[in-house]
Amino acid sequence: VYPTHRSASLPAAVLEATKQNAVNTRMVSGGNGLENFQTANPFPIPKDGLEVIWNHIARYRGGSMRRLVTQATPQPNGSYSLVYFQEEFTFRDALTDFDASKESNVLFYFKQRVTAPSRLAGNVLLVHETLDQVKEPRLAWLYNAGQRRVRRAPQVSYDGPGTAADGLRTSDNLDMYNGAPDRYDWKLEGKKEIYIPYNACLLYTSDAADDSLR
């Protein structure tokens, strides 16, 4: 267990947008979309569970990022296989040529490429994440490297199977929760102290073997 640090900081523009959201942002389409929303953190003073989930979905994540991800798929006998991804993520506000008049319902753009094992390497998932996914479902495409074909991927949502997870993860499991909130009833159940995977930089940067982290 690592000690907690207040290691998050936000740009002044994001803090100002958050102040404006506190006054102006409201939910539309039965809670499935946002109106008058700027940049990040739509409900800085959340009143219910749905507003808390929207704060998670639309939180500030640095504008854009690129990361390497390792996914383990464990089996009942304790064996497991590893899949390696390169992921790229960009919020619309980080794009200088973003045209809100054409894609006003887009929240961010996401690309995930499998780099290993070789049987999956080169497969790519591309997502245009929409704010109101009941009004306009998430736009997703899959490139199959073996077939050299691109197909639309409407199954990449809700409880559709997660990439290369052998059915052990759903699409909306990624990032704790993602996508439209309409299929759940969100409630605040109070607060309790828990351990969370945060401030674990020594673990992330260590040379610990995979077996020791199972």
What are these regions (language model features)?
Residues 1-137:
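Solvent-exposed N-terminal domain segments of exported/luminal and surface proteins
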Residues 27-30, 75, 164, 187, ...:
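Generic detector of intrinsically disordered, low-complexity, polar/charged segments
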Residues 125-126, 132-201:
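Acidic, serine/threonine- and glycine-rich low-complexity intrinsically disordered segments
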Residues 204-211:
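Conserved small/polar residues in nucleotide/adenosyl-binding loops
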